[in-house]
Structure formats: C-alpha cells, structure tokens
C-alpha cells in the first residue's frame, strides 16, 4: 500500500514522502495513529492544502521536544534491584520501569519513546536512547545496582574514568591484583586445611 507520510518516521521517510509499505503496517500503525494517509488524489490535495499547518505543528512539537531534551540529555537514572552474586537480576529493568522512573523525576515520557532493544538483566551502567520526537533523540544512563551506595560508587568510578582514563586503568589493575591476592590467600588456606 502506498501512503503519504504526515510526519518523519525513522527508517521510512520524511513528511510528505509517498512510500510503499506493507498493508498491515499501514492499517495497524500508520493510519490509526494519524502518521500517514492512504495515497489517493483527494488525500494528495488535502495534504498539499494542509502542508503549511502540518509543518508548523511539526516545528512546534520539535521545539517542545528540544526543550525537554536539554533537561533530559545525560541524565543518570538509578534503579535499585535485587541481584544474585554473579550480578544477574532476579527480575529485569524494562522500558516501563525506565518510564516510571522518568515520571518520578518529572518527565512525561511514553513507554514507546524509550528505545530499549531488550530488558536489562544484569547490574551495571547502560546507555539508553529516548526518542522525544522523530528528529530529537537523547541518551540517558540507567544505573542498575543493589543499593544507592553501590550506584553512587559506580557513578564515581565512571566519572573517574571520564576525567582521567589512565588513573582509572590503574585503579582497575590494582583492584584486579587485590582480588587475585585474595583468591591466592583463600587457596592457600584451603590447602593448609586439606
């Protein structure tokens, strides 16, 4: 089915483009959400008549999205979750959880705007994209930790890595040496007991 796009759609086209899409995609997504019109002579005339208004509306939405993007870009969200010894979560962190945390921070974001390919299932720091407008996409950092203190330690380590990468590498090397020494001591204790 050929449709006329009423707004920019990622991986498809820009406003006013006539594109060929699968019938189901048009009927189930583009047409109901008023993101496109079926291609016909009357719809082409309608689009050309409304083009200036649609462009003005699109610019207004883009401006609003950019205003939110300034506040949201680079935000660190802390998600406290229970996890096993290996760092694997007992549950997961999904787009819904991220949306709920953003709402608690005062942002009005729909779940579909959080671009998360798969749920987060391990502790750590994750870069996540949020699409505020088809042309405005920001990146936030989701920190998944067992506690607030662990999240702050992770944030401090990441900040140290950004400020002085050579010091961070040295800190990681020292941490690995200390861990290896601890394991060697445990092995020696087991040998003496055995």
UniProtKB/Swiss-Prot annotation:
Q: Does the keyword Transmembrane helix apply?
A: no
Q: Which InterPro entries match?
A: Ribosomal_bL9, Ribosomal_bL9/RNase_H1_N, Ribosomal_bL9_bac/chp, Ribosomal_bL9_C, Ribosomal_bL9_C_sf, Ribosomal_bL9_N, Ribosomal_bL9_N_sf
Which cellular components does GO assign to this protein? ribonucleoprotein complex; ribosome
Q: Which SUPFAM superfamilies does UniProt cross-reference here? A: L9 N-domain-like, Ribosomal protein L9 C-domain
- Keyword set includes RNA-binding: yes
Q: Which GO terms describe its molecular function?
A: rRNA binding; structural constituent of ribosome
Q: Where is the composition biased (Acidic residues)?
A: 166-194
**Sequence segments annotated as region (Disordered):** 165-194
Instruction: State the Pfam families in the record.
Output: Ribosomal_L9_C, Ribosomal_L9_N
Question: Which PROSITE patterns does UniProt cross-reference here?
Answer: RIBOSOMAL_L9 (PS00651)
Record's signal peptide: none
**Keywords recorded for this protein, A-Z:** Ribonucleoprotein, Ribosomal protein, RNA-binding, rRNA-binding
Which GO BP terms sit in this record?
Answer: translation
Q: Which PANTHER family match?
A: 50S RIBOSOMAL PROTEIN L9
- State the NCBIfam families in the record: L9
Please give the function described in this protein's UniProt entry.
Binds to the 23S rRNA.
The record's family statement is: Belongs to the bacterial ribosomal protein bL9 family.
What is the protein name for this chain?
Large ribosomal subunit protein bL9
Originating species: Rhodospirillum rubrum (strain ATCC 11170 / ATH 1.1.1 / DSM 467 / LMG 4362 / NCIMB 8255 / S1)
Taxonomic lineage per UniProt? Bacteria, Pseudomonadati, Pseudomonadota, Alphaproteobacteria, Rhodospirillales
- The gene designation is rplI
């Amino acid at each position: 089915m050929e449709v006329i796009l009423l707004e920019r759609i990622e991986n498809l086209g820009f406003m006013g483009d006539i594109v060929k899409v699968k019938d189901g995609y048009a009927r189930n997504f583009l047409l109901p959400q008023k993101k496109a019109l079926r291609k016909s002579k009357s719809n082409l005339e309608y689009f050309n008549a409304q083009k200036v208004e649609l462009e003005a509306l699109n610019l207004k939405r883009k401006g609003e999205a950019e205003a939110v993007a300034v506040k949201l870009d680079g935000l660190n969200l802390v998600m406290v979750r229970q996890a096993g010894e290996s760092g694997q979560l007992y549950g997961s962190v999904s787009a819904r959880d991220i949306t709920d945390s953003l709402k608690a921070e005062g942002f009005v974001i729909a779940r579909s705007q959080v671009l998360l390919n798969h749920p987060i299932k391990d502790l750590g720091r994750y870069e996540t994209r949020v699409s505020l407008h088809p042309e405005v996409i920001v990146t936030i950092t989701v920190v998944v930790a067992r506690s607030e203190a662990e999240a702050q330690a992770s944030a401090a380590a990441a900040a140290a890595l950004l400020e002085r990468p050579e010091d961070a590498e040295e800190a990681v090397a020292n941490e690995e040496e200390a861990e290896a020494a601890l394991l060697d001591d445990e092995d020696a204790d087991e040998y003496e007991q055995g």
